[in-house]
Structures are given as C-alpha cells and as structure tokens.
C-alpha cells in the first residue's frame, strides 16, 4: 500500500468536501431558480437567487435542530401513527416556510409573496420526503 503525505491527504479530503458542498449549493440554486421562473418571482439578478439559495440552506441547517426537537416532543403524547406523521409533516412545512420567509426578508432584491414562500416550502418538503424514501 502506498503511503501518502498527510498534507496531500488533507488536501484531497478538503477538495472532496468542497466539491460536495458546491454540489449541494448548486442543486439548491437550480431548484430555487426553476421555482422562481415557474412562479414568475421578481428578482434583480441570478446572483441574488444564488445568495437566496445559500442563505436558505444555512438558515435551514440552523432551524433543523429545533424542528427535530418539536417533532420529537410529539412522542410524549399518546397519538396514533397517522396523526404523528401528519403533525410531523405540518411542523416540517412550517419550519420550511419560516426559513423561506426569513430568507426573503433578509434579501431585499427578491420579492416573494406569501404564496410563493409556501410553494418553495412545499417543494422542499416533497423533495425531502422523496429523498428519505430512497434506500441508503
């Protein structure tokens, strides 16, 4: 087996993680750009849509622990499986809407109506559910 220099190994690993992060951001950008085009959303430039995608991703990562905590709190109630799934979906949709709304408020060069914010949240909820249904 060939031994690598630790700095080269670290560089290769860093490049892999950077490429993976870029793929995630570009996927978010593509989905949001397509949604904005279909919904007729007004925005100043594609760079603002990219900024929206990055802020949406970061805020989503910040809000996710609170979303998971709220969903986990439903286990303390004696609810049926269907009601639990419904409540979890509602909480996920509301947190995604809160992320889209907060991102819209932070970026002044994109003008989203509340309906468009809910469409963004619903699309990302559907994508999340489709992704979680795939085998690992």
UniProtKB/Swiss-Prot annotation:
Localization (cell): Cell membrane
Keyword vocabulary terms for this entry: Cell membrane, Membrane, Repressor, Transmembrane, Transmembrane helix
InterPro entries named among the record's database cross-references: YrvL
Function: Negatively regulates RNA polymerase sigma factor SigO-dependent transcription. Prevents the expression or secretion of OxdC under nonstress conditions. May act as an anti-sigma factor.
Mutant phenotype after disruption: Cells lacking this gene exhibit a slight increase in OxdC accumulation under acidic growth conditions and a huge increase under nonstress growth conditions.
Triggers of expression: Expression activated by ComK. Positively regulated by SigO and its coactivator RsoA.
Listed name of the protein: Membrane-bound negative regulator YvrL
Pfam families hit by this protein: YrvL (PF14184)
Organism listed in the record: Bacillus subtilis (strain 168)
């Amino acid at each position: 087996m060939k031994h690598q220099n630790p700095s080269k190994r670290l560089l290769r690993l860093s490049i892999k993680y950077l490429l993976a992060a870029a793929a995630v951001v570009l996927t978010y950008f593509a989905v949001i750009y397509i949604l904005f085009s279909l919904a007729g959303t007004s925005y100043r430039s594609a760079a603002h849509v990219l900024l929206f995608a990055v802020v949406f991703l970061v805020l989503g990562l910040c809000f996710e622990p609170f979303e998971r905590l709220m969903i986990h709190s439903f286990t303390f109630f004696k609810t049926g499986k269907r009601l639990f799934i419904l409540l979890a979906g509602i909480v996920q949709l509301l947190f995604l809407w809160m992320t889209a709304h907060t991102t819209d408020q932070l970026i002044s060069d994109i003008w989203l109506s509340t309906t468009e914010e809910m469409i963004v949240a619903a699309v990302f909820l559907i994508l999340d559910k489709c992704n979680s249904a795939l085998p690992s």
